């Protein structure tokens, strides 16, 4: 059943953080949620060319703090910070509270699921062959240290009359392992034949107790194990 559930959703609180970290009273929750949605929608539209990966929203003390994860921070900041100041003012107007914008650079875009999916989508819209785009993404991810990657595209591939899906995989992608750090993302390409959907799974390694599994130390306590064995 590992393929029947969202890979990011099932790992929240285990190896995946939330994209919105705030608490609210019952009468404020709906307004905050609606504000988050509008802020994300606005930033996604405004920063289409900035290689946007994630948007993390926090709400400390009647204000809003937005962290934008991007592979092209210069595009977001603009000359002398003019663009980011415009974004801050727009976000403050949408949310109705003072806003703060932070920029976080994505060092390896080839290992970011959302950026890989968006890259494949843009190539398909430029009429690059889908197999070439998929293989290029897989090779780049594995070259930069990914433990495994799977890429799937679906739709009227190559202009075919009957829609189908094809996928490539290299390395391991253990969807059943909750401690596996799997970056899952989707995107869509609007071609002259219709919409083509793209799904990307990138396995970066296993996380155990907040550290890589290779460096984890087994607990020294043996008493609970002895008690369980005694019951058997």
From Swiss-Prot:
User: Does this UniProt record's set of keywords contain Plastid?
Assistant: no
Write down the superkingdom of origin.
Bacteria
Which residue ranges does the record assign to the KH type-2 domain?
39-107
- Any Gene Ontology biological process: translation
Give the record's GO CC terms: cytosolic small ribosomal subunit
GO MF terms listed in the record are: mRNA binding; rRNA binding; structural constituent of ribosome
Record's function text: Binds the lower part of the 30S subunit head. Binds mRNA in the 70S ribosome, positioning it for translation.
Subunit-structure text:
Part of the 30S ribosomal subunit. Forms a tight complex with proteins S10 and S14.
Q: Which protein family is named in the record? A: Belongs to the universal ribosomal protein uS3 family.
Name this protein carries in UniProt: Small ribosomal subunit protein uS3
Q: Which organism is it from?
A: Vibrio atlanticus (strain LGP32) (Vibrio splendidus (strain Mel32))
């Amino acid at each position: 059943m590992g393929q029947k559930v969202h890979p990011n959703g099932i790992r929240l609180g285990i190896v995946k953080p939330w994209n919105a970290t705030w608490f609210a009273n019952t009468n404020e929750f709906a307004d905050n949620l609606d504000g988050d949605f509008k802020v994300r929608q606005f930033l996604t539209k405004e920063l289409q060319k900035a290689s946007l990966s994630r948007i993390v929203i926090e709400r400390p003390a009647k204000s809003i703090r937005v962290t934008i994860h991007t592979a092209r921070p210069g595009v977001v900041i603009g000359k002398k910070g003019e663009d980011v100041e415009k974004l801050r003012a727009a976000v403050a107007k949408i949310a109705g509270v003072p806003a703060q914008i932070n920029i976080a650079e994505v060092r390896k875009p080839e290992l970011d699921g959302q950026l890989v999916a968006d890259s494949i989508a843009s190539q398909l819209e430029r009429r690059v062959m889908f197999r070439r785009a998929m293989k290029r993404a897989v090779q780049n991810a594995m070259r930069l240290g990914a433990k495994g990657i799977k890429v799937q595209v679906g739709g009227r591939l190559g202009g075919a009359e009957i829609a189908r899906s094809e996928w490539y995989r290299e390395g391991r992608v253990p969807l059943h392992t909750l401690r596996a750090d799997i970056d899952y993302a989707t995107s869509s390409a609007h071609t002259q034949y219709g919409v083509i959907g793209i799904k990307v799974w990138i396995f970066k390694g296993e996380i155990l107790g907040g550290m890589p599994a290779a460096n984890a130390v087994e607990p020294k306590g043996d008493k609970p194990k002895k008690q369980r064995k005694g019951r058997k």
